[in-house]
Amino acid sequence: MSIKEDKWIRKMALAHGMIEPFADGQVNLNPETGEKLISYGLSSYGYDLRLSREFKVFTNVYNSLVDPKRFTEDTFISITDDVCIIPPNSFALAHSVEYFRIPRNVLTMCIGKSTYARCGLIVNVTPFEPEWEGYVTIEISNTTPLPAKIYANEGIAQVLFFEADEICEVSYAERKGKYQKQQGITVPFV
């Protein structure tokens, strides 16, 4: 397996719709206001994805136990805004601005941006499997004892693309993965 470079990512995004919308290069300034942004877009060996304006912030108002087999929407408060405040020692779900279509011979890994990590915010995204497509559901944990702010339409994590030496026998699409073509924020289900 080898990591893919910027030229390959650009070609796959523009010719095959692997990433839509696609920012060809690192964007770190708002083009309208000149304000500094947490960067997003194409980098040397990856692509920095952005958060959308939709968030689900964890609340324990209706639950006393988190059970991944019986998870309900009322576990979260829904927010649509340019920023989201995550309570201390809590977490939020969001989804990417970008829609991804992963080729059959590719697996991705997603790593949180250091800007957030250095503030005590941990980003978790599972791998995008061969032939998976959809908006990425992103989990952001606030490990600090203080409220933490995250920004919509700015970078949150870097996606690394790995090309396999051989094609897999069964892709995510073929095994009818439960998160295939997910739209918006998708909460866990079994």
Swiss-Prot record:
One of its GO terms (biological process) is dUTP biosynthetic process. Gene3D superfamilies: 2.70.40.10. Pathway: Pyrimidine metabolism; dUMP biosynthesis; dUMP from dCTP (dUTP route): step 1/2. It catalyses: dCTP + H2O + H(+) = dUTP + NH4(+). Pfam families: DCD (PF22769). It is an enzyme of class 3 (hydrolase). GO terms for molecular function: dCTP deaminase activity; nucleotide binding. Keywords: Hydrolase, Nucleotide metabolism, Nucleotide-binding. DCTP binds at residues 113-118, 158, 172, 181-182. Catalyzes the deamination of dCTP to dUTP. Homotrimer. PANTHER family: DCTP DEAMINASE. This is dCTP deaminase. It comes from Chlamydia abortus (strain DSM 27085 / S26/3). The gene is dcd.
